[in-house]
A protein has these predicted regions:
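Conserved small/polar residues in nucleotide/adenosyl-binding loops
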Residues: 172-173
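Conserved anion/nucleotide-ligand pocket segment
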Residues: 109, 113-169
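Glycine-rich Rossmann-fold phosphate-binding loop(s) that bind the pyrophosphate
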Residues: 8
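Rossmann-fold NAD(P)-binding glycine/threonine-rich loop
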Residues: 76-97, 108, 116
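Rossmann-fold NAD(P) dinucleotide-binding segment
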Residues: 42, 56-75, 84-85
Length: 173
């Protein structure tokens, strides 16, 4: 497989290392310094683009890959208010987009358990739910995509919850 890495920060470098260890090839590495190379000509021959950038850049990066006919895997968080718009564009163009706020198997199992527990708590009005997270000092987005996904899972299962606020991240009703 020949991959393009879009975003060569902490996560992008880790992805590059894993891809190379597993025998895959890196066809392009695109970050802020060469963002203008995110086009069909520079992505020719790429099998998949792995996009882990910033909230401000993600939408445009993914759209450019879709326009170039390159399937995209994205893990950038903090921009998902436009995710449905982008998924619609992707379908319209016949593209492929896979997005997750966290790619860790254990965390995705936790997402499922979270929803199940929220369903169980629906009947207990006397109890409430709160999410508090602590991260390393280099964490760029807060709340994290993982915390937001957990909050959205709770909101989807507990009818009295209508949203969340970041003071710190709390569910509201």
């Amino acid at each position: 497989m020949k991959a393009a890495i879009i975003g060569h920060g902490k996560m992008g470098r880790e992805i590059e290392k894993i891809l190379l260890e597993r025998g895959h090839r890196i066809g392009a590495v695109i970050d802020e310094a060469n963002a203008s190379e995110l086009d069909a000509a520079h992505l020719a021959g790429i099998d998949v683009a792995l996009e882990f950038t910033t909230p401000d850049a993600a939408y445009g990066n993914i759209r450019a890959c879709i326009d170039a006919g390159i399937p995209v895997v994205s893990g950038t968080t903090g921009w998902t208010n436009r995710l449905e718009e982008l998924r619609s564009y992707c379908r319209e163009k016949g593209g492929a987009l896979f997005y997750a706020s966290n790619y860790c198997l254990g965390v995705n199992l936790m997402f499922r358990l979270n929803r199940r527990l929220a369903r169980m708590m629906e009947r207990f009005d006397a109890y409430d739910v709160r999410i508090e997270e602590i991260h390393h000092t280099q964490k760029k987005d807060a709340p994290s995509g993982t915390a937001i996904t957990l909050a959205e899972g709770i909101i989807s299962e507990i009818g009295r919850k209508t949203g969340w606020v970041n003071e710190p991240l709390s569910l509201i009703h």
